[in-house]
Curated annotation (Swiss-Prot):
Gene name of this polypeptide: prmA
Gene Ontology CC annotations of this record: cytosol
Protein name: Ribosomal protein L11 methyltransferase
Species name: Neisseria meningitidis serogroup A / serotype 4A (strain DSM 15465 / Z2491)
Record's keyword annotation contains Amino-acid biosynthesis: no
Principal location listed in the UniProt entry: cytoplasm
Amino acid sequence: MPYQQITVNVNDAVAERLADALMEHGALSAAIEDAYAGTQNEQAIFGEPGMPAEQIWQQSKVIALFGEHDEAAAIIQTAAQECGLKDLAYTGEILEDQDWVRLTQAQFDPIRISERLWITPSWHEAPEDTAVNLRLDPGLAFGTGSHPTTRLCLKWLDTQLKNGESVLDYGCGSGILTIAALKLGAGFAVGVDIDEQAVRAGKDNAEQNNVDAQFFLPDGLPQGQFDVVVANILANPLRMLGEMLAARTKQGGRIVLSGLLDEQAEELGGIYSQWFDLDPAETEEGWARLSGTKR
C-alpha cells in the first residue's frame, strides 16, 4: 500500500512538540532532521562530543509518514493548532509500497575506493578476490563508504598508512575506518564513539571482517598515544576536540580530519596548525580532508 510522506520546516522551539502531536493523532512515524544538513549551516547532530545532552537544530524539518487513506492534512492542522502554529506550510509526496529490504540492497553495490580497496555488502560477491575487501552492510551507524568524507579517509589510509602503525578512529560510527586500517596493515586499531549503538556495530562489523579491532565509548578509551589519529566527524566537534586529538597523537605521528565542508577547511586548518604541520587540503564533492604531522 502507498504511504503519504509529509515534510514541515519549523524552528527548535516546536519541532519535538509537533512530531509528538503528529504521532498522537495518527502518524505512523515522525522524524526530526537538520533543515540545513549538507550545507555550510548544518549543525552537529544529537550527542556530538562537547554539545549539551539535550539538543535540537535551530531550523529543523519534521518528516511524518501516514497511511494511504489517512487524513494527513487534517492531522497536520490539528497538530499545528496544538503547538500554536498558524498557516503551517508543508510539502507532501506519495511513497509506493515496495520490498524495502530488496530495494535497500539494490541501492548498495560494491564501492571501489582505490586499485586494491573495495567495500562490499554481504549479499554481494567480492568483485576482486585478491583485493582488500571490506565487508560492510548499511545500518544504523554512520559510515558505509558511500559518503565523500569516508572515501577521503579511506584513500589516505590506503596510500599513507605504514605497516604496524597504531590507529585511533575517533567518531568511528560503523567502524569502517578502524577495520580498514587493520586490513591495510595497522598493527593495532581502536574505534571510539559516543553512541553505544555505534560501538556495538563496530564490534559486529569487525567480527564479520575477521579483524581484532577494539571499540570503546570515550570514557572507556585507555590512556596512550597513537601513530595515526583519524576523526571523520563534523566541523563543530573538530573545533572543540583539537587539543584532545593532538594529545592522543604521538610526536611525529599523523592526523587525518574529515567531515568538514570545503569552505570550513581553512578555519579548521588554522586551529590544528597549533600542533601539526598540515598538508594541502584534499576535496571531493564539496567536502574536505585535512592531514598533517605532529611537531
